């Protein structure tokens, strides 16, 4: 029987609080990645910091229900990160962000031992990866990282050389040129999501394109 690949997502989490409905949902890039990976048949764990409030329980309980390992989540006295979100014409609009206990997050020695068991470690730009991704990389652990549209953030310069696969959100022209420039910063493979234009990847030799799947959007 084939072994399930094991992914550990590390970094930010938050409660996405929708102001119109006054409802909160688990969110954060690494949180979402861990859930998607289990949906695809892999094993996943999440490492990050949550507070001792209802938001922390929401994050942990939600991940458990999706079969994500939460054994290395740090529960810290204080508030869980919260993003307030509005819906306008069917699109999400991010209003403000309170980082809460994630502001001081970094990985522990116990976390590092756990990360060494992973086939891949993934992170995102809001999770203070500059504090620990260089060490993860130096230990030879395969890494992927989502820079969103913050690839010129000062922290990104520290992380680029430590990443095998880099993801970006990009809405400018000449996506191919953009991926070439990003790959020069260190990653072996660069992937840009392009909204309605799908996505594009570049491995230094060839470009790969993927379109979108049209779907009906409920604008209520």
Predicted stretch roles:
Residues 80, 193, 220:
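Ser/Thr-centric signal marking residues that sit
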Residues 2-8, 62-64, 70-74, 88-215:
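Ribokinase/PfkB-type carbohydrate-kinase core domain
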Residues 25-26, 30, 214-220:
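Short glycine/threonine-rich catalytic loop with a Thr-x-Gly-x-Asp
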